[in-house]
Swiss-Prot record:
Pfam families: TIM (PF00121). It catalyses: D-glyceraldehyde 3-phosphate = dihydroxyacetone phosphate. Belongs to the triosephosphate isomerase family. This is Triosephosphate isomerase. Keywords: Cytoplasm, Gluconeogenesis, Glycolysis, Isomerase. The active site is at H88, E136. Involved in the gluconeogenesis. Catalyzes stereospecifically the conversion of dihydroxyacetone phosphate (DHAP) to D-glyceraldehyde-3-phosphate (G3P). One of its GO terms (biological process) is gluconeogenesis. NCBIfam families: PRK04302.1 (NF003302). One of its GO terms (cellular component) is cytoplasm. Pathway: Carbohydrate biosynthesis; gluconeogenesis; Carbohydrate degradation; glycolysis; D-glyceraldehyde 3-phosphate from glycerone phosphate: step 1/1. It is an enzyme of class 5 (isomerase). The gene is tpiA. Coiled coil: none annotated.
Length: 213
């Protein structure tokens, strides 16, 4: 199934009361798996939306205990959160932390969309078999040039690399229209990771529909 993760980041347009309004307007798609990644303080509202799947934007490899400021998988699961982004370009981690967090998540049945910025990282981390590898070149994030246009050959190679491990690939950075999505799918990607193109749009639902329908 085609997967779309919408990362709300800390954008004011989808924060606090705006988050509730944003999610309330989302349509249900029969052939698309839609996942929303809200700001951490909005995750407690996830239980109000039983028909929406939620990821955290980050998670740590700790459990319950004396871990000030950390985000435990167990705590997220108690709120109905089913997975998390990990190693996003705005929240990068070291290799040891990535490995330990992915392994802990797998033990608990918690999904991880592991973000990578290069083919080398895709090679290194696909062997961990996260739920998804999300390829986002840092220099294209938030821009108007899509990754499918700027780096099509790298997407194809990452799809091949991850395919040998059975890991689906999402692509992000600069995805703004249906043509960008179609190019990504033609290159073998199984979904997209989007943010500002939807969240900061004057009509987020229309923008989302333009990518999906």
């Amino acid at each position: 199934m085609f997967t779309v993760i919408v990362n709300l980041k800390n954008y004011a347009e989808a924060n606090g009361k705006n988050f509730v309004e944003f999610v309330s307007k989302l349509p249900k798609y029969d052939s698309v798996r839609l996942i929303i990644a809200p700001a951490i303080l909005d995750l407690h509202n996830a239980h109000e939306f039983r028909n929406v799947e939620f990821f955290s934007q980050h998670v740590d490899d700790v459990g319950y205990g004396p871990y000030t400021g950390h985000i435990a998988i167990e705590s997220l699961m108690n709120y109905g959160i089913i997975g998390s982004l990990l190693n996003h370009s705005e929240r990068r981690l070291g290799e040891d932390k990535i490995i330990s967090t992915v392994k802990k998540a797998q033990m608990l049945g918690f999904e991880i969309a592991l973000c990578v910025e290069s083919m080398e990282e895709a090679k290194r981390y696909s062997a961990l078999k996260p739920s998804f590898i999300a390829y986002e070149p840092k220099e294209l994030i938030g821009g108007n040039v899509s990754v499918s246009t700027a780096k099509p050959e790298i997407i194809s190679e990452i799809v091949d690399i991850c395919g040998t491990e059975g890991v689906p690939v999402l692509v992000g950075a600069g995805i703004k229209n249906r043509q960008d999505v179609r190019k990504s799918l033609d290159l073998g990607a199984q979904g997209i990771l989007v943010s500002s193109g939807v969240v900061k749009s004057p009509d987020p639902v229309r923008s989302l529909n333009s990518l999906i329908k």
